[in-house]
């Protein structure tokens, strides 16, 4: 009996654990501190800084099953999903890693043992082929002489991409940095399937399928292209879980493995589909995985960056559900079946199931309102099409008006063998794309490119002043030996009391100083293991190796500490008041305010906001001790410590506890006791995205300032109402009631005046071919009274055509009325349109009543004068 996908995942991790590897949990799909990457798309992403030497772990061997997304950006599989056997937006990458530990020999032997041993995967050895980089004789000989693979099944792959070291079998992180040859393992499905071995003209067939890529990082590529051997070479491997599951379960398509069969059946059930071979079922089964896990990792549907990619995937799934005949919202109903089929890998998703379902349901409902109209428009345009390409302007209109991502439009067109003019679409989108790029923060940032070999020791938990030594200087992202007065720079010290921005807490400000210089620190950021002090040299000069005194702005840090501790109390209070579905989706803690984004599906009620405030202030009055402990990550989670969205944690973590009320993982700076916070006040609650709310709050002196401001406002209002704050509500109610009564009386007077004006106007009507025509500009009449006057005049005049106008604040208001016995010859909508056009406006309405507005008051007399001639022509 073949292994299930869940069993294959566990077997892989168990095998490498038995070989001394640390089992590391999958990192978030949102890469940590890597603006170059849209989504986590490979197992090595979370170890990138380790390979670059910027981070150190307490293990040298690791194994993971990493959740990955490839949709948007450089790695984009979206358009192929549903049309091929192996493309997915979401997949799991099984990997084993060596950080300067074992190398080629052990990496190859481990792979061979796992794949072929009867205890593990037991694949037939004769079905396995391998490739090596053309000049990697070492790997070739290991495969041939130690493993025993015949020469005819070992294929050398050279530089096949037009440049030295540009090969399918040579991996590189970028233009410079760690790189090296790789060896790939292929499985031969048999000659009943078309395709040839790797490197052959038929290699794109489905007979020979790559199942494992083993990268040997043994060189450091220099800017001039030279390859320097790394002192401690490393190993990075990746094997797609879905691909190896297809091999072990003896199927040729990833969509035929147990995991997808179960999901496809669930999709069929919620959409009412009966043909299980329909490609739309495969699309939806794939898309629920990427969408659900992206939302669980904090991504929300939006029109920018990661949120827009998520929205595109959701809408593509909804459209395929529409094709299957789904009559109601269905997509969110697949989260439960997904959790069931993912097994232990779905535990994070299960904790957030209600939130994920609500976000998906809301997004589907919003898109459903425009989907049918958009598809109808697209059908109309395609029916009129004479060629085989839909113009970019129409594609953009579908996006702008109906929310159709261009790839969804392309999806529909492809089914009819029609292309989309994507260049034209991009031209129409360019301005919006430029704005999105600017807003995203994904633009150029010299400091983001800084790479520091040294590490900084943070001593800011216990010190606000400290002596240190300059270990590196950077100007515009480039290392320099010295800086002079007036230069902006990043200064790295061997030890520092300055806190670098992390966990939502902003970086410290302060001063680095010596006998002959002063450097104003405006921000503090992390660069790998180093801490960079960002600012400007105010006086003197500073060079690498200089001793400095580092002074943190103590008052600012104190305010930040209070706000950060209050954030923890509020998080716990929200979970008590609203429910345990609340989880952090983002935060900002500075010296003025704390901002907290959290999962919740509706606006908080006033009584809920008050309950959270009261609960936090109760903990402040308890004056609970705020304590920190260092412990293993798993032990901390077992203790109930909450981990924060978007943060990457080491194996040893700092656990912050506030009595029995709050326990979280946190590396930030905090008060000593909750009583130090003094007072907590929520100043706003709002929505930021579907299923995400935002609270802003203040503490300490900031909270007291808001109390004083509220008191001052109440005193001012009480003075204006000639009362005091004790009976202010009664005073306001009395004023409002009196105001409503006066407004009612005023409206009655206006109606009486309008009726009198109508009576006066009726005598000014003239006869045009047996119909009474009345055209008049009125002064001192509110625009909204014109309609009442027209109704009165129609009752008085019988067969009639009426045009009334008034000007208020430079804007023209027009209304036309036509008695029903005349509407077969004169229509009010046409008449008002003719007049409005002359005063720079437009309007419309029914044949018997229409209204309009305009901006050119000076043209009004001439426009009204033209009515008689126009009507006469119509009545002849």
Curated annotation (Swiss-Prot):
Annotated PANTHER family: ALANINE--TRNA LIGASE, CYTOPLASMIC (PTHR11777:SF9), ALANYL-TRNA SYNTHETASE (PTHR11777)
Binding site for Zn(2+): 564, 568, 666, 670
Locations listed in the record: Cytoplasm
Cofactor note: Binds 1 zinc ion per subunit.
The enzyme's E.C. designation: 6.1.1.7
InterPro entries with a match to the protein in the record: aa-tRNA-synth_II/BPL/LPL, Ala-tRNA-lgiase_IIc, Ala-tRNA-ligase_IIc_anticod-bd, Ala-tRNA-synth_IIc_core, Ala-tRNA-synth_IIc_N, Ala-tRNA_ligase, Ala_tRNA_ligase_euk/bac, DHHA1_dom
PROSITE patterns associated with the record: AA_TRNA_LIGASE_II_ALA (PS50860)
Protein name: Alanine--tRNA ligase
Description of how the protein assembles with itself and partners: Homotetramer.
Domain free text: Consists of three domains; the N-terminal catalytic domain, the editing domain and the C-terminal C-Ala domain. The editing domain removes incorrectly charged amino acids, while the C-Ala domain, along with tRNA(Ala), serves as a bridge to cooperatively bring together the editing and aminoacylation centers thus stimulating deacylation of misacylated tRNAs.
The organism's taxonomic lineage, starting at the top: Bacteria, Pseudomonadati, Pseudomonadota, Gammaproteobacteria, Enterobacterales
